[in-house]
Regions:
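Active-site loop/lid in soluble adenylation, ligation, and acyl-transfer enzymes
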Residues: 3-16, 20-135
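Acidic, proline/serine/threonine- and glycine-rich low-complexity intrinsically disordered segments
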Residues: 137-139
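Conserved small/polar residues in nucleotide/adenosyl-binding loops
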Residues: 141-147
Length: 151
């Protein structure tokens, strides 16, 4: 069996995920766990992915021996899990990345002190697919080197 057959044998057939995979491969793109694939999605593809994922999450719950039929806490949990993964936990995968903006900060007319920024970080471990939450603190100051170059 060739390596290409083994690599492609896992792919679902006739699904929205398969259509997206074909677009990515045609573009010679990559779709690893940490990659942003938003440029390959049509407007309603996220909703279609949720619909495709829902019965799969229901199957996981069934395999975990959770009574989805009678447990009111588990009613529609497959859909909620699918929505959570697409719209929240992995939203950076399916939405365009934001543009970063740089602002000038010249010593003569700018802020001269230490800038400290605390940013909340929400991510997903690409190995275990579990949420990772934290805070990153970044501090920097404007600096003029002896050569009059600004840093």
């Amino acid at each position: 069996m060739s390596e290409d057959i083994l690599k492609d044998s896992w792919e679902p057939k006739g699904t929205i995920s398969q259509e997206i995979i074909k677009k990515i491969k045609a573009d010679k793109g990559r779709f690893w766990a940490g990659d942003n694939i938003s440029k390959y999605l049509e407007e309603d593809d996220k909703q279609k992915l949720i619909e495709e994922l829902t019965p799969k999450f229901e199957a996981v719950l069934d395999s975990l021996v959770i009574d989805r039929a009678n447990d009111p806490n588990s009613n529609d949990t497959g859909r909620r899990l699918a929505k959570m993964y697409i719209n929240e936990l992995m939203s950076g995968r399916y939405n365009p990345m934001p543009n970063a903006t740089a602002f000038p900060n010249h010593v003569e007319d700018g802020y001269k002190g230490m800038l400290v920024v605390r940013s909340e970080i929400k991510s997903l471990c690409s190995h275990h697919h579990q949420p990772v939450n934290g805070v990153a603190s970044v501090s920097y100051t404007h600096l003029t080197l002896p050569t009059n170059r600004e840093v």
